[in-house]
């Protein structure tokens, strides 16, 4: 416990808040190239084959990111846009791929929540 004089001389150090998406370096999104596209299984109470991609970003950092929606066209060397946002039941997956931009096509046949999946308005 510091004395009053010690606090006057030095003051308390402000706690820095940690970023939830450090690889983005304070940018809203980042572009990257898929190095590996694969499926993985979620943590204990859940069971599925979740689609994920390993992406090398333009700043040189390699991250694992989730491919949302039903079906995708991504493969190795696909150029994708990454945003922050973790997947709770996949450890180490802290980023999402933005659908409907660059090489990633929007979800086909999507009627509701279309903007989140890059789906165009049905005619």
From Swiss-Prot:
GO BP annotations, alphabetical order: translation
GO molecular function: rRNA binding; structural constituent of ribosome; tRNA binding
Keywords noted in UniProt: Methylation, Ribonucleoprotein, Ribosomal protein, RNA-binding, rRNA-binding, tRNA-binding
Cross-referenced InterPro entries: NA-bd_OB-fold, Ribosomal_uS12, Ribosomal_uS12_bac
Cross-referenced SUPFAM superfamilies: Nucleic acid-binding proteins
GO CC annotation: small ribosomal subunit
The keyword Ribosomal protein is assigned to this record: yes
Pfam family, one: Ribosom_S12_S23
Residue list for modification 3-methylthioaspartic acid: 89
Keyword Chloroplast: no
PROSITE patterns xref list: RIBOSOMAL_S12
Family the entry assigns: Belongs to the universal ribosomal protein uS12 family.
Known function: With S4 and S5 plays an important role in translational accuracy. Interacts with and stabilizes bases of the 16S rRNA that are involved in tRNA selection in the A site and with the mRNA backbone. Located at the interface of the 30S and 50S subunits, it traverses the body of the 30S subunit contacting proteins on the other side and probably holding the rRNA structure together. The combined cluster of proteins S8, S12 and S17 appears to hold together the shoulder and platform of the 30S subunit.
Matches recorded under PANTHER family: 30S RIBOSOMAL PROTEIN S12 FAMILY MEMBER
Subunit structure: Part of the 30S ribosomal subunit. Contacts proteins S8 and S17. May interact with IF1 in the 30S initiation complex.
Record-given protein name: Small ribosomal subunit protein uS12
Organism: Trichlorobacter lovleyi (strain ATCC BAA-1151 / DSM 17278 / SZ)
Lineage: Bacteria, Pseudomonadati, Thermodesulfobacteriota, Desulfuromonadia, Geobacterales
Gene assigned in the entry: rpsL
